Amino acid sequence: MKAYAKANIFLKLTGFDSRKYHLLESRFILLKDVFDELELVDKESDSKKEFEIISNFKCENNIIQKAYLLLSKRYNNELKELFSKKSLKLTKNIPVCAGLGGGSSDCASFLLLMNETLNLKLNLQELINLSIQLGSDIAFFLSGFHSANVSGCGEIIEEFEDDIPNLKWTFPQISCQTKAVYDEFDRGIFDFQKNNNQAQIYKKLSTKELLQNFKNKELNDLFTPCATLYPKMKSYLQEDFFLSGSGSSVFKVDR
């Protein structure tokens, strides 16, 4: 099963919820050319792990592990039986700490794979309700939408009929830590009401219109704090690249 990456075309921070989590308004688009892959494979006879992930990257504290534990509360017997014979193979292609939602997409694909393999018969809303307990971007990947306006803490998804130009991607070898970038944003001067007003305009426009008519700093509130924390990102800000998420992946319209 393929776990596709996403890009944020705009990302405006508009306040905090009761937990002090950031509220956002954003346009997410699915990137069908950038994906991880998940599959069930036969378990090695000498493996002693109850749930084993075989991967080309370090999996400790992985969000998939958390999804497994959450599902185990309701489907412990089914999961134990399956993973007594199978391991989960995860092939990572999506850059890590790059603003492309790789971990969230992997988690969504794992939930979908378990729903299908074990015939759990969970509908989309039930899957989204589970995902809210795991992470903020997972709901978009569960939806299957190619483009959506996303709000709240990432759990409110509205499909958007979009016009998406070809994008040319650059993946700097810089690991941008999401929490650190958000914390840097919080140290600055911001106007949540202004951000929300801008977002209400942006969410009505196509991706093509947004990238043609607005500056990179206008579209993504995290670009300036990202460049402050990671000075090598400043050149991309100055050269009119657009930033996805909290970085470090950047893009331009491929003209």
Curated annotation (Swiss-Prot):
Enzyme Commission designation: 2.7.1.148
Pathway listed: Isoprenoid biosynthesis; isopentenyl diphosphate biosynthesis via DXP pathway; isopentenyl diphosphate from 1-deoxy-D-xylulose 5-phosphate: step 3/6
Biological process annotations from GO: isopentenyl diphosphate biosynthetic process, methylerythritol 4-phosphate pathway; terpenoid biosynthetic process
Annotated active site: K6, D137
NCBIfam families tied to this protein: ispE (TIGR00154), PRK04181.1 (NF003216)
Keyword tags: ATP-binding, Isoprene biosynthesis, Kinase, Nucleotide-binding, Transferase
Family under the similarity heading: Belongs to the GHMP kinase family. IspE subfamily.
Disulfide bonds: none
Binding-site positions, ATP: P95, V96, C97, A98, G99, L100, G101, G102, G103, S104, S105
Species for this entry: Campylobacter jejuni subsp. jejuni serotype O:23/36 (strain 81-176)
Cited function: Catalyzes the phosphorylation of the position 2 hydroxy group of 4-diphosphocytidyl-2C-methyl-D-erythritol.
Keyword Nucleotide-binding on entry: yes
Gene Ontology molecular function, alphabetical: 4-(cytidine 5'-diphospho)-2-C-methyl-D-erythritol kinase activity; ATP binding
Name recorded for this polypeptide: 4-diphosphocytidyl-2-C-methyl-D-erythritol kinase
Root EC class: transferase
Transmembrane parts of this sequence: none
Pfam family of the protein (one): GHMP_kinases_N
Catalytic activity: 4-CDP-2-C-methyl-D-erythritol + ATP = 4-CDP-2-C-methyl-D-erythritol 2-phosphate + ADP + H(+)
